Every structure is written in structure tokens, then in C-alpha cells.
Amino acid sequence: MSSDYRTGREGKEFAYRGHSLDELQEMDVDEVAELLPARQRRSIVRGLGTEQQKLLEKVRSRDKETTADNPIRTHLRDMPILPEFVGVTFSVYNGHSFERVQVEPEMIGHFLGEFHLTRSTVEHGQAGIGATRSSKFVPLK
């Protein structure tokens, strides 16, 4: 994967609601909040919590070269992804373990927790002996 995030997957210039990635990264958090969907906008307008402020400061003070090697570990699944997060690797806690999330421009406006689910999909096997009425007559081998 290339480290140039200005072009999207199809080779077109990335734009979020009519703004390029460079324009978004130059904007203030309050200006970006006006472009976000309602739920994310509301969480920013009401004020980020102290833990979210700490995470934002950690991202701002971090070296871009060390992000892939040392991801930022966080439990904040409800943190909206801002343009400043593009290119940063997070380890997001899903209730069981920390899962890596490499932030790409297409993720702007979503929450960190949306990219690693807390529940795994259940794939049931065959029913056991006696589990259903019809399985009572299956030979035991």
C-alpha cells in the first residue's frame, strides 16, 4: 500500500464533502465538525472528553514514521476519526484484545470502533445426538 493518501483507490483525488485531504488537515476541529455526519458532529460540538482530548494530543505530538511500528493503544471506540488521524495506526480494544486499525482517508467521519467488531460471527456446526427429534434415529457410527 502506498503512503500517498491524496489519491483514492481508483486513482482519483480524494475528497470528503467537496474538500481535499490537504484542505481538511488544515482546518480546525470545529470546522471539520460541520462537515461530519450528525452523530459525530454532536459528539465534537458537545466537547470531547478528557480521554479523547488526550488521544488527540497524542496523535498531534506523534512522529509519522513510527506509527506503523508502535500503534497508539486505546479503548476509545467512540472517538470520531478526524483528518489528522490519516496515516496513523491505532490498536483499538474490542473487549477481548487490541486490534490494529490503519486510518485511511475513506474512514474520516466514522468512529474508531466501527472497524473492529466486539462480537464474532457464530457459525454453528451440525446438531448433536438428541438435539432435535429427527437426530434421535441417526446411527451412532
Swiss-Prot record:
Pfam families: Ribosomal_S19 (PF00203). The keyword rRNA-binding applies. InterPro entries: Ribosomal_uS19, Ribosomal_uS19_CS, Ribosomal_uS19_euk/arc, Ribosomal_uS19_SF. One of its GO terms (molecular function) is rRNA binding. One of its GO terms (cellular component) is cytosolic small ribosomal subunit. GO terms for biological process: ribosomal small subunit assembly; translation. Belongs to the universal ribosomal protein uS19 family. Keywords: Ribonucleoprotein, Ribosomal protein, RNA-binding, rRNA-binding. Protein S19 forms a complex with S13 that binds strongly to the 16S ribosomal RNA. The keyword rRNA-binding applies. This is Small ribosomal subunit protein uS19. The gene is rps19. It comes from the Archaea.
